[in-house]
Amino acid sequence: MTRFSTIVEKLQHRLFKSVVSNNLVYNSCWEDPRVDRELLELSSDSKVVMLTSAGCNALDYLLDDPEVIHCVDSNPAQNALLELKVALFNNSNYQLLWDFFGKGKKTGAEIVYYRKLRKFLASEARSFWDQRISYFSPNTSLPSFYFRGTSGKFALMIHNRIMKKGLYPQILKLLNADNLSQQAYYFEEIEPKIWNNFQKWLIRQHVTMAMLGVPATQRRMIEDRYKGGLLHFIRSSLKHVFTELPLKDNYFWRVYITGAYTPGCCPNYLANEYFHQLQRRVSKINTHTRTLLEFLKRNPGKYSHFILLDHQDWLADKQPKLLAEEWKHILHNAAKGCRILFRSAGNLLEHLPDFVFQHLEFREDKTAKLHQIDRVGTYESTHLAIVK
């Protein structure tokens, strides 16, 4: 590698770190909890350690009534988001929860926050939302919370492109299609009209990927596997999701495109039928603003589940020593039979420390089929490892 290339990579890493450190990056989770719960097999004695992201999936896992869920994230913004969701459950008003996170907007959000929600938040989350509760106040240019945060800004750009091209009615027909044939028809009509030269250029830029929470390591993994690079990967992933999987319950892409959920297409934590059940269980969630390694050093124990999202990708290339140390602590704190779930933009297993494979059994027989029906569809692989 040339000295110039090394400098460029360092600048890219610094850019990514500056974007994701304290900004709200993920306003919703991008891992399918329906797949997760089938793989995890949670029960009443489960002690879960997971990365927070937007907190949607932690709430979903509560439906299986685990003993405790430790949500760990080095970004305080992500934990603040989960704490606000928990506050809405503690406030005992389903309609308010739906307004904030189902519709993504609430008239008078600031008044509601100070009168009803702020008292439920820890000091760090209070500081965050004191300055940003207006994210839920609708306006013409930013009509939804789901167009806020760094990933939300890119979603807004796609949304505006759809509106400008007059494609929104067709998009709704696509999302509400009755069968795969209808989905394929509308997708083939719409897809070429979304991607102009500017969008194609933008998707190749490192700053765009940083806004979406995609580090340079993941980008390289994708480009190594796909001849057409990142753009080809994105377009082929979208084609799979929009033409080969039913969209009627695909709330991930509905909220990304429209900025809102519907009662029939939303995460479980927003479904009215689960509100009181989750309200009784949200006290089982604990948030920790630190790295996973720091959490394990401060909170040793025998945990039954680790949910690592795509975090391993972030360390694999640039911080192999840190990756190895993290795995040593995971294995040291894992109970026998512990289930470890993670995803990757490539074939991450080849990047894991050698000693890991002595202690784990990878269940590709379980993950291969479920990965194909994952409603998000933007990861190259899903991995479930069971501690021997």
What positions do the PLM features span?
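Conserved alpha-helix/loop element of class I SAM-dependent methyltransferases that forms part
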Residues: L24-K47, C56, L323-A324
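A short acidic, Gly/Pro-enriched loop at the edge of an enzyme's catalytic core
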Residues: S46, R290-L308
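Core SAM-dependent methyltransferase catalytic element
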Residues: D365-K388
